A protein has these predicted regions:
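Active-site helix/loop module of the DD-peptidase/beta-lactamase fold
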Residues: 180-223, 262-263, 288-325, 330
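Bacterial N-terminal signal peptides that target proteins for export
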Residues: 1-10
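Active-site Gly/Thr loop motif
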Residues: 309-313, 365-429
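Active-site SXXK
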Residues: 145, 162-186, 210, 282-286, ...
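N-terminal leader/targeting segments and the immediately adjacent pre-domain N-terminus
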Residues: 22-155, 212, 216, 449-457
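Active-site-proximal alpha-helical segments within enzyme catalytic domains
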Residues: 213, 278-285, 324-348, 416-433
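Bacterial N-terminal signal peptides
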Residues: 9-19
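Short, charged, amphipathic alpha-helices and their helix-cap/turn boundaries
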Residues: 128, 146-150, 192, 226-267, ...
Length: 457
């Protein structure tokens, strides 16, 4: 696969995704958005390491919106590492001493390649990370709890960075914990836990189907929805940011959610369609079951136990609900600590296991291959590009990909990722700020290939 066909900086690429839009009005909105200051790429990701001058920051603040950030241009480099300047946030605090991660570097990983989805061989890991088109900012790979590879071409290690949809893995993990502990019956309708949505199409959605992204509602976050400023996805993100929608109106989150419509002829559980809108509702479910704010529950169950170096910052909607589908922020090393709790090396970061075997088993087995195949998950560009020769069996419990061997992966917008492989005792995490819809993210393939190679050592 030749990435030169996807040169990010070229405005000539815009028609590639404009042609998929549903209406001329949407085309015009995207074209206008691409002309705004900071929407296109002129800066390398290394600019984040150097910092930005006041003129740049002032411009980023003036242009801030959910859609402007989605474009992944120069301003997005500032948003992904300084997001708490724009949306209110709460903090899940660490507790106790920092869990030190030993460095046992394996230089040979820099030369790692893998067979991509089209059967071709990738460039080396180091070459990909150093390629300015990749927009990778930080990568870490750990084996048996030790850091065996790390690189920070586009951020400082101590900087906080947005998780984007990697955050969904946290929501799914917490709900699976609650299910395993008998605190929730996941066969019940999701509106039993979110009364504000009673009387809407959400009444037809069992909690377990929402957890597995098979709601039967027309709320998919496909490529078109991501770039359509009037989609349900962009509307809910705008409501959470507290910024006007495409029609200039600041919407209430529950009003947006109540607008969801059922897909004709499709019942919940039949087709898995990726959706941040679903996870938005699941965060409210966690709060209803526990009687705690989402942030405090994350702190109690996970963040205070992993020896994190920094707080986990979680943005809040104007109504105070945590934006748990994407607006979490931490250092990359703390994300790696979180990834370790799913592996046999959990003891490196915690004095007790946080993810019970039953919880892990449910996430590894509790979904439908038929719903996965029928839905849009296999069509995601990163799935095709990385795993056409090694396909996941399904998505599950908010994880995007689960393999037969039990490995799990969650991808995030603007190209973030978490790979955790319990059988091989390997985790991989990465941050980036890459425009959506312009080129596939190839880092996930390196993570899985590294796990296979390291397990043989």
């Amino acid at each position: 696969m030749n990435l030169s066909a996807f040169r990010f900086a070229s405005i000539a690429l815009v028609p590639l995704f404009l042609s998929t839009m549903a209406t001329a009005q949407t085309n015009e909105a995207v074209e206008a958005a691409m002309k705004a200051p900071g929407a296109q790429i002129t800066l390398p990701v290394s600019a984040v390491r150097k910092g930005f001058n006041k003129e740049f920051v002032d411009s980023a603040r003036k242009q801030f919106s959910n859609f402007h950030m989605q474009l992944g241009g120069d301003h997005a480099l500032y948003y992904t590492t300084h997001f708490t300047e724009f949306v209110p946030a709460a903090m899940a605090l660490p507790s106790g001493p920092v869990s030190e991660l030993k460095r046992l570097p394996k230089p040979e990983l820099a030369d790692l390649t893998y067979t991509m989805g089209d059967g071709s061989t990738s460039k080396t890991l180091q070459a990909h990370i150093n390629d300015p088109d990749s927009r990778v900012q930080g990568v870490m790979i750990l084996h048996k709890g030790n850091v065996v590879y790390e690189a920070f071409p586009g951020m400082r290690p101590e900087q906080l960075h947005i998780w984007a949809s990697v955050a969904k893995s946290m929501v799914g993990t917490l709900l699976t914990m609650l299910e395993s502990e008998g605190r929730v019956d996941t066969s019940r309708p999701i509106t039993d836990f979110v009364p504000e949505l009673k009387g809407s199409e959400w009444d037809t959605v069992p909690l377990i189907d929402a957890m597995n992204m098979a709601s039967g509602l027309d709320i998919s976050e496909d490529a078109e929805a991501t770039m359509n400023p009037r989609s349900m996805f962009q509307r809910i993100v705008g409501a959470d940011f507290g910024v006007p929608n495409a029609d200039g109106v600041v919407e209430d989150e529950m009003d947006v959610l109540r607008d969801a419509k059922q897909i004709e002829g499709e019942d919940a559980g039949e087709v898995a369609r990726y959706s941040s809108v679903i996870t938005k509702v699941l965060v409210a479910v966690v709060e209803d079951i526990t009687g705690q704010t989402y942030t405090s529950y994350v702190e109690d169950r996970i963040w205070s136990h992993i020896g994190a170096r920094s707080p986990l910052v979680i943005n809040l909607s104007p109504q105070g609900l945590a934006v748990g589908y994407g607006l979490l922020h931490s250092t990359l090393e703390d994300l790696a600590r979180y990834a370790l709790i799913f592996t046999p090396s959990w003891h490196v970061v915690s004095d007790k296991p946080l993810v019970a075997p039953e919880v892990l088993r449910k996430m590894q087995t509790g979904s439908s291959a038929e719903a996965y195949t029928a839905g849009d998950f296999p069509d995601h560009s990163w799935v095709r590009a990385n795993f056409g020769q090694d396909m996941p069996i399904f998505n599950s419990h908010q994880w995007d990909a689960v393999w037969e061997d039990g490995a799990l992966f969650k991808h995030g917008n603007l190209y973030q990722g978490i790979y955790t492989d319990p059988a091989r005792d390997v985790v991989g995490v990465f941050f980036a700020t890459s425009p959506v819809n312009l080129a596939p993210d190839l880092v996930p393939g390196y993570m899985r290939e590294a796990a296979k190679k390291l397990a043989k050592q």
